[in-house]
Structures are given as structure tokens and as C-alpha cells.
């Protein structure tokens, strides 16, 4: 998710390169995160004013457009916001356009041609200004500013305390869709976070299909339930709070598939993460322990009892060496339980995923 490594020599499975629409979403994500790290020096977070006390906690893009603003006031805000963008960070001008696009709605035309033209905003200008300052000065991720991430064919609600879904993780959903008979199976999404994977998989399922999504974080469970209800898949997705397999005792041995994008960053690497990630995204969703493998190994331990015979699993990893280690580990320790275990490339040609089948 966050590391870069050398192009692997071999791969068992090559994912297709991003399609044009997916490439646009990938660019939006990259311009919202990694490019900021490269172009804008960190600024102490103490410089930014707090949000207004009465600020609405609802994600910006889900709020009603209840704040009429005249042309002149909006233009003045745009000038002030643009003036904060340093010459080294031109991508922030795109973020400003996206912020105003997410915050705006068409205003009804007035019957009086002399009436001033109004813009309908989803937040008052003082709140938008505070949100913008937090993004520019505090390096707060743009996705947290607007409250969403464009992911696959979804607009996923996100907020502080929930990991922002990455474009490469979309491949997990594609791999689920390639499993024979997946539509009618029961699936587990462990460490669901925003619920993006669970919702995307649920939208592909047939009448008998179901997703059990778990997370230990109360905030993640709340946001995942919001996304499940927004997309109307509450009859397909059951969100359960708890750690990994613990909430799934009643479906043990009945799962067609287990999916997880767990924390896999080595603890010593956390201080070196770009500020957008290290300062703001939840450590709970990032820290994989000394070698980044703590949670991945725990998931491997629970797989054989969770999956039905022939069941499928796919985990996201930190890439290359971590994936290769997991493949060797599973094939050595559980050779009698699993087959067709292999590393899978992401669209950057990194061995990002490990997948396989229960015998």
C-alpha cells in the first residue's frame, strides 16, 4: 500500500493495467497524498485554527447544500485559498477545485434578473477555510477534508480514524470476482475499515451471498455501516465489531473466502511515512509490528478453520519480500491445508497480494 520496491522477476498473475476511469481515480488519490509529500515541506500543526465549534460532523459531500453564498464572497475565498498554495505545490490548486466541487450544488435560478447570483454550499465559508488550512498547513489528507475517497465505482465515506482506501486494493475485489461460484458464497472482510471492500464485494453477490465484515475500531465500524447503508447492501453485509476472526465463531468453516488488507508497515518505518499518512491516518491500521508481519501471521493461523474446503483467501501486503515470505511460510507450515498459494502483482508490478485456496 505504501512502499515501493524493485520490479519482481516472476509473478504468477498479472493484474490488468488501470482502465481510463480507474486511472483518473488513481491520479486523484496520488495527487491527494504522495505528491504533497514530495512538494510541500511539513508545517507544524499548531499553526491552523480549529474548526468552528458548531461544525457539522457529517462528511462534507453528504451534507445538504444549505449555505447560500454570493459570487463575490466565493471568489474572495477562492483567492485567499489559492494564495496559500506555495509555488512548489501546484497540485493543491487541483485540490481547491475539487474541494469547491464537492462543497457546491447548483443554485436555483432567480426570477429576478437583478438579484445577485448565489452559490449553494454544503458548509459555511469559515468552515471551508478552516478545512483548507488544515489540508495545506497541517498536511491533513484531502480525503479527510471532503469526507470521501473515489474507489472503484464507489464514493466511499471516510473520516479521521479510518484508513483511506488505496487504488491498488481494488484488485482484491477483482480477484474475488474471478473465483468460481463466488456470487453465492459467504465472505469475510477482516479489518474492514471504511467497508469499501465489503460493499464492493456485496454489490456483486447473488441472493445467497453474504459478507461478514469485522473491525476492532469503533470509528471504523461506524463508518463502514454508513457506507453499507448508503449503497443499500445492508441485507448482504453484516458489520461485526471485534478483532479479526473473533466475531466469526458462528460461521467458522463455512466461508467461501477470507479477504484482508491488514496493518503491515514495520513499526520502525512508521516515523518515515509521509505526513499525510503518519500524522493523520490511524496507527492501528498501519502498524504491523517489528517486521510488519504480526497481523498477517495471525490471519494465516486462523485461515484453515475459517474456510470451507475449496475456499479462497487473499491478503494485501507491504510488497515483494513480505509477500514472498508469506507464500513460503504458508506452503511450508500448511502444505496439507492450502494449495495454489502465490504472490500477485499490483498495477505497479509490485508483488502486493498473497492468494490461495483451502484444500
Locations of the language-model features?
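N-terminal chloroplast transit peptides
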Residues: 1-27
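N-terminal mitochondrial targeting presequences
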Residues: 2-4, 24-63
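Conserved AdoMet
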Residues: 59, 94-179
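Residue-level signal for inorganic ion chemistry
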Residues: 99, 139, 169, 197, ...
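Conserved SAM/SAH cofactor-binding pocket of Class I
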Residues: 168-272
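Helix-to-beta-strand junctions that scaffold the AdoMet/dcAdoMet cofactor pocket
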Residues: 206, 281, 307-309
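Mobile active-site "lid"/loop adjacent to the S-adenosyl-L-methionine
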Residues: 262-295
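Conserved Class I SAM-dependent methyltransferase catalytic core
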Residues: 290-358
Amino acid at each position: 500500500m505504501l512502499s515501493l520496491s524493485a520490479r519482481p522477476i516472476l509473478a504468477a498473475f498479472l493484474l490488468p493495467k488501470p482502465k481510463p476511469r480507474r486511472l483518473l481515480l488513481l491520479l486523484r488519490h496520488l495527487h491527494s497524498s504522495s505528491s504533497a509529500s514530495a512538494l510541500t515541506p511539513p508545517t507544524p500543526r499548531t499553526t491552523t485554527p480549529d474548526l468552528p465549534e458548531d461544525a457539522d460532523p457529517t462528511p462534507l459531500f453528504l451534507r445538504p447544500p444549505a449555505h447560500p453564498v454570493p459570487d463575490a464572497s466565493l471568489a474572495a475565498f477562492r483567492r485567499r485559498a489559492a494564495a496559500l498554495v506555495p509555488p512548489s505545490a501546484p497540485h493543491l490548486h487541483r485540490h481547491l477545485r475539487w474541494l469547491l466541487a464537492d462543497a457546491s450544488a447548483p443554485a436555483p435560478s432567480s426570477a429576478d434578473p437583478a438579484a445577485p447570483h448565489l452559490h449553494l454550499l454544503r458548509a459555511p465559508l469559515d468552515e471551508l477555510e478552516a478545512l483548507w488550512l488544515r489540508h495545506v498547513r497541517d498536511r491533513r489528507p484531502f480525503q479527510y477534508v471532503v469526507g470521501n475517497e473515489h474507489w472503484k465505482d464507489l464514493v466511499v465515506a471516510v473520516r479521521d480514524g479510518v484508513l483511506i482506501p488505496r487504488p491498488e486494493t481494488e484488485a482484491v475485489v477483482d480477484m474475488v470476482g474471478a473465483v468460481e461460484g463466488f456470487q453465492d458464497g459467504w465472505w469475510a472482510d477482516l479489518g474492514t475499515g471504511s467497508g469499501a471492500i465489503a460493499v464492493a464485494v456485496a454489490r456483486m453477490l447473488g441472493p445467497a451471498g453474504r459478507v461478514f465484515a469485522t473491525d476492532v475500531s469503533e470509528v471504523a465500524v461506524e463508518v463502514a455501516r454508513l457506507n453499507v447503508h448508503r449503497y443499500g447492501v445492508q441485507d448482504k453485509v453484516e458489520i461485526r465489531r471485534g478483532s479479526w476472526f473473533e466475531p466469526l465463531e458462528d460461521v467458522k468453516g463455512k466461508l467461501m473466502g477470507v479477504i484482508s488488507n491488514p496493518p503491515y508497515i514495520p513499526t520502525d518505518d512508521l516515523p518515515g511515512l509521509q505526513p499525510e499518512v503518519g500524522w493523520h491516518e490511524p496507527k492501528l491500521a498501519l502498524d504491523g509490528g517489528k517486521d510488519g508481519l504480526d497481523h498477517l501471521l495471525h490471519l494465516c493461523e486462523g485461515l484453515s478453520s475459517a474456510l470451507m474446503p475449496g475456499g479462497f483467501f487473499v491478503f494485501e501486503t507491504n510488497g515483494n519480500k513480505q509477500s514472498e515470505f508469506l507464500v513460503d511460510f504458508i506452503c511450508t507450515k500448511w502444505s496439507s491445508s492450502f494449495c495454489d498459494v502465490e504472490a500477485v502483482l499490483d498495477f505497479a508490478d509490485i508483488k502486493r497480494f498473497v492468494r490461495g485456496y483451502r484444500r
